[in-house]
């Protein structure tokens, strides 16, 4: 950035000032040149500077522009501009979410940069995939994936290993596809879906001349166990049918990442994760990633119209602010907090004559309760504890089990961002109400 300040101040001061400016701009230049998530997070002032410089490239910032279109990024207040970081034109074009927008060169660069940083971030965690940030959350991102499967592979029925998650069910309904549920079975305390039952469902649909797509679940509340995505991916490869994975909070723990790495050797068309659950953004954005670049392109083509830049910018801000080094530290802290949660729950269970359920989940734990679990969860809420989930044994949706589950229970989470003091406090409150 050339600034002519010659003669305004002494030469030695001019040189010193230009050096400082150059070093500050170098941080921005490095982001644009390297196009990788930084190892160490960048401070907010430099992030704001980057966003401001990019937004100044959009045509609505041109002081001599003549605006005669029906969509010219006209907003009434500065408050509205601030809400989208001044990217009022949004992202994408009517035919493709990731296409550059002629009226918004800056927003187009911002979106492309976000996707590049997102791919490098996932690579730093061990996932060598293509990725896009989406302007919609998990459920609608799943709908985009299913819509793309319908368009590319003529899929007309979703094979869904049953999980009590409304988003995938509504996503399927939203795009007008039929869903075939595969029932869960009880294995000790765990609720799971047998891979053989999934294959049976696939075979039946194919025999009826249908084109199934499998929507498996990697992350969910216990006692529902993660689907065996590696074996499902093998089956989908054998039958040559698409496979979408709901991995809402898969990025935050290596337990899930390792499962993904193994499964990605076989048939996975797309994985969907949440930006708020993994990247500390406000709710509203999603992350879709896959090794199949052509299918990712197909997904972007299913989005109708332009989109708000807000969820995309929030993902970019998180990637820049956190940095890969601090994110790995946050993952480590999450694992330590989960270990502490398990230990304290075991002590509490012994004290109260309850049981910590033996479930395979690196994020959440379950403790039984002789009291009404909904009442317990309600009391925790009134004690200013948010997040615990009370489930009655006969709640077929809550337990993910279509028969009666053996226990009433409370689910307590230890997701990324939680602190040890939060764990101690929730156990203290649980002690009061159990």
From Swiss-Prot:
Start and end residues of each stretch annotated as Phosphate loop (P-loop): 92-102
Protein name (Swiss-Prot/TrEMBL): O-phosphoseryl-tRNA(Sec) selenium transferase
Lineage of producing organism: Archaea, Methanobacteriati, Methanobacteriota, Methanomada group, Methanococci
InterPro entries per UniProt: PyrdxlP-dep_Trfase, PyrdxlP-dep_Trfase_major, Sec-tRNA_Se_transferase, SepSecS/SepCysS
Keywords per UniProt: Protein biosynthesis, Pyridoxal phosphate, RNA-binding, Selenium, Transferase, tRNA-binding
Coiled coil: none
N6-(pyridoxal phosphate)lysine modification, residue list: 277
Pathway membership: Aminoacyl-tRNA biosynthesis; selenocysteinyl-tRNA(Sec) biosynthesis; selenocysteinyl-tRNA(Sec) from L-seryl-tRNA(Sec) (archaeal/eukaryal route): step 2/2
Binding positions (pyridoxal 5'-phosphate): 71
Residues the record lists as binding substrate: 93-94, 101, 306
GO biological process: conversion of seryl-tRNAsec to selenocys-tRNAsec; selenocysteine incorporation
Protein family according to the UniProt entry: Belongs to the SepSecS family.
Role according to the record: Converts O-phosphoseryl-tRNA(Sec) to selenocysteinyl-tRNA(Sec) required for selenoprotein biosynthesis.
Catalytic activity: O-phospho-L-seryl-tRNA(Sec) + selenophosphate + H2O = L-selenocysteinyl-tRNA(Sec) + 2 phosphate
Molecular function via GO: O-phosphoseryl-tRNA(Sec) selenium transferase activity; tRNA binding
Record region (Tetramerization): 1-40
